[in-house]
Amino acid sequence: MKILSLLKVALVGSACGLSVLSAAKTEQPNILFIFADDLSYETIRAHGHLDIDTPNLDRLAAEGTTFSHAYNMGSWTGAVCMASRSMINTGQFVWRTPRTGGDFKPVVAARETWSQLLKSAGYRTYMTGKWHVSMDAAKIFDVAVDIRPGMPKDVKEGYNRPVDEAAYEAGWKPWETKYGGFWQGGTHWSEVIANHAEGFLAEAAEDDAPFFMYLAFNAAHD
């Protein structure tokens, strides 16, 4: 049985239980899913990291939902995040989740991706940022803006780590805009994505339909 089916059963069961407690609570919640790339849970203070303060992330953890038992059991590619994204969007384990564009076709045709299921439930769906899945985001989300397949175009300056302080002073810096990379028109890619998200939130505020936003940053990936 697919995980999606199990989730459906769990959600239905939860809904039945809640209806007994409060029949009035039938409103569908808005869903903002924030995807941080290669960010370990151990780097967030709310999850036990005490060396660095992360007040905004802590507030999100306190006011939202964190999945502390979610686990990626492996990958079929060197880019582990690619398998992770496939599993998240299809609800399938790593040994069953699609890998290539052709593998995704039956899943999309059956409208079994996460966003498609939510669209069927009446949600307006939105995606921006790093996708890295062999599906066309524009076909499974209502709105798909500035979709990146993976990382920015690589340049040797970005991967030649300085061997000493002198080499660092003379070399390229990650915040320099001349090679493009994480910069778009002088604005860092994280800010570009966040600006898109703010724009959609303002638009969604005028819409009665619930929304699902898939907000995928490249950060904190190096």
Spell out what each predicted region is.
Residues 2-7, 14-222:
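Formylglycine-dependent sulfatase
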